[in-house]
Amino acid sequence: MANPRSNRKKVKKQVVDAVAHIHASFNNTIVTITDRQGNALSWATAGGSGFRGSRKSTPFAAQVASERAATAAAEYGVKNVDVLVKGPGPGRESAVRALNAAGFRVQSITDATPVPHNGCRPPKKRRV
């Protein structure tokens, strides 16, 4: 006999304050929206949003990825967002603007780009 409780919908927890982690590398942009404890609510990438190759690293691709993560996080009732930006990529600015345009109140923007104290040797300079 079937389990009588199988038709119950899973209730999504309501999170009002969230943290948007934006990892903007030179090749891609990853947007993850978490609660204050760091549990992921939603995420999106520029590559997963339909952009491939060099189009992944554009500001528009970062904007689309940010919008997709924002719509998924809105189902959890997210209203206020602290933004944590990491990396030197071209999608930094546009991803933050897209979160603001999605209806979230951006409370703070923090740059958490890791800066080496002369650690690993950087990649060689490009000769085009």
Swiss-Prot record:
The keyword RNA-binding applies. Keywords: Ribonucleoprotein, Ribosomal protein, RNA-binding, rRNA-binding. InterPro entries: Ribosomal_uS11, Ribosomal_uS11_bac-type, Ribosomal_uS11_CS, Ribosomal_uS11_sf. GO terms for cellular component: ribonucleoprotein complex; ribosome. The keyword Signal does not apply. One of its GO terms (molecular function) is structural constituent of ribosome. GO terms for biological process: translation. Belongs to the universal ribosomal protein uS11 family. Part of the 30S ribosomal subunit. Interacts with proteins S7 and S18. Binds to IF-3. PANTHER family: 40S RIBOSOMAL PROTEIN S14/30S RIBOSOMAL PROTEIN S11. HAMAP family: Ribosomal_uS11. NCBIfam families: PRK05309.1 (NF003698), uS11_bact (TIGR03632). Located on the platform of the 30S subunit, it bridges several disparate RNA helices of the 16S rRNA. Forms part of the Shine-Dalgarno cleft in the 70S ribosome. This is Small ribosomal subunit protein uS11.
